[in-house]
Amino acid sequence: MAKEESIKMNGTVIETLPNTMFRVELENGHVVTAHISGKMRKHYIRILTGDKVTVELTPYDLSKGRITYRAR
């Protein structure tokens, strides 16, 4: 069975939560809870409040996501 395509959206980190979780406000105004992807964790990429990020959302649960990129 093939994996479902994830939805990629841009947003801004508005709050830092425990356990490398973040509250991200998407461009369309929705607020989601997101965690860091494994490669970002491996390369020690730090994310701070106010950073512009790219978030992948699954079509099954649009309230949770994975941060895959931090814009400079």
Curated annotation (Swiss-Prot):
UniProt entry tagged with the keyword Protein biosynthesis: yes
**Signal peptide coordinates:** none
Name the keywords, alphabetized.
Cytoplasm, Initiation factor, Protein biosynthesis, RNA-binding, rRNA-binding
Keyword flag Cytoplasm: yes
Which Pfam families does its entry note? eIF-1a
Cross-referenced SMART domains, in alphabetical order? S1
Domain S1-like span(s) in chain numbering: 1-72
Q: Which domain of life is it from?
A: Bacteria
Q: Where in the cell is it found?
A: Cytoplasm
Q: What does this protein do?
A: One of the essential components for the initiation of protein synthesis. Stabilizes the binding of IF-2 and IF-3 on the 30S subunit to which N-formylmethionyl-tRNA(fMet) subsequently binds. Helps modulate mRNA selection, yielding the 30S pre-initiation complex (PIC). Upon addition of the 50S ribosomal subunit IF-1, IF-2 and IF-3 are released leaving the mature 70S translation initiation complex.
Q: Which PANTHER family match?
A: TRANSLATION INITIATION FACTOR IF-1, CHLOROPLASTIC
**UniProt subunit comment:** Component of the 30S ribosomal translation pre-initiation complex which assembles on the 30S ribosome in the order IF-2 and IF-3, IF-1 and N-formylmethionyl-tRNA(fMet); mRNA recruitment can occur at any time during PIC assembly.
Family designation = Belongs to the IF-1 family.
Q: Under which name does UniProt file this protein?
A: Translation initiation factor IF-1
* Species whose genome carries this gene: Alkalilimnicola ehrlichii (strain ATCC BAA-1101 / DSM 17681 / MLHE-1)
Q: What is the lineage of its organism?
A: Bacteria, Pseudomonadati, Pseudomonadota, Gammaproteobacteria, Chromatiales
